[in-house]
Every structure is written in C-alpha cells, then in structure tokens.
C-alpha cells in the first residue's frame, strides 16, 4: 500500500472479527474503517484512506446484515466541479439468493440517492466483490459506469468499480490476489 502510494484501498473478505483490534491491521499513514461480518467467520469489508485526507464514516447508511461500508473523503485537492468523494466497498457473498441480491441492489440505489441529494457535486465510487450480482439496476438508473473491463477471477468480472465520474479514473489494472 505504501509502496504504491495508494490514497484509498478497499478490501473485501477481510475475515476480521471484533476479536481483532484495529491496531493489528493498521497501516502507518492510513486511517482504517472496517465492517466485520456480524455473524460467523469470513466476509467483512475495510477501507484504508490516506491519513492526510479528511474522512468520515457514513454509519447512517449501514445495515447490520449487509457487508457494505460507506465513507466520505475530502482530499486537499479535487477537480473544481467536485465537492467530495463518496466511497462504498461492498461484499456480496456467493451464497446470496435472488431475494438477498434484490435487497442489496435496492439498498445500493437508496444509498446512492441519499448521497447524491446530500452531495450533488460528489464523485461516487462503489467497489467490491459483487460475485454474480447483476448491477445493471443501479448502473442504469443512476447512470454509473463500470470501470473494470477485464476478468478478475476466471473468465468473470467479479471485482468491480462503478462511478458517476469515469473521466476521473484511469483504466483498472488487475493485480494478483493478496493472501
């Protein structure tokens, strides 16, 4: 993370629990925001943000049984029309049935609506491991673009990044998995 000078790092399937203190997974120079799976092992999401950036967890958007974490980020410099960055990291487990997937899609759309009303000039990034979730419902209705164009696992694009600001993003580079 430090080697690449990353500003924001989103992680899915952290496998962290409340037994693991933040200091055990801290990275120098970064603030850690995490949401562990509420029940059982596995899952979980986390975001590391450069500690020079003003960051706030948007806990009012969180739902206990969904593995989704939202943060707002205010870097020192942003292109003129942008006021703030909104970042969501999502883990959609492969065992989600159609009802769970539909609920997750509706939740994402609702949260995006709320964020766009509150921050109409925000650049929003929704990223994570979507497994086989059909994201067309929120990409069409919210006019979000999918940035990742190359397969991330096997022949499928499971790890995705959607944004309302594709011109602010370079082409995604697929790296080998960590761990």
Q: What are the language-model segments listed below?
A:
Residues 1-179:
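A shared catalytic/ligand-binding motif for oxyanion handling
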């Amino acid at each position: 993370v430090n080697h690449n000078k990353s500003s924001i790092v989103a992680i899915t399937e952290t496998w962290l629990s409340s037994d693991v203190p933040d200091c055990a997974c801290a990275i120098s120079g970064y603030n850690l925001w995490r949401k562990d799976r509420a029940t059982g092992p596995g899952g979980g999401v986390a975001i590391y943000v450069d500690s020079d950036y003003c960051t706030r967890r948007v806990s009012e958007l969180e739902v206990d049984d969904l593995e989704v974490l939202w943060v707002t980020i205010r870097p020192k410099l942003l292109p003129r029309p942008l006021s703030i960055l909104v970042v969501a990291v999502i883990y959609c487990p492969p065992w989600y049935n159609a009802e769970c997937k539909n609920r997750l899609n509706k939740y994402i759309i609702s949260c995006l609506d709320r964020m766009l009303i509150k921050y109409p000039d925000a650049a929003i990034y929704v990223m994570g491991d979507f497994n086989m979730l059909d994201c067309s419902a929120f990409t069409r209705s919210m006019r979000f673009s999918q940035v990742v164009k190359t397969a991330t696992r096997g022949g499928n694009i499971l790890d995705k990044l959607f944004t309302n600001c594709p011109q602010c993003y370079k082409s995604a580079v697929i790296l080998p998995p960590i761990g």
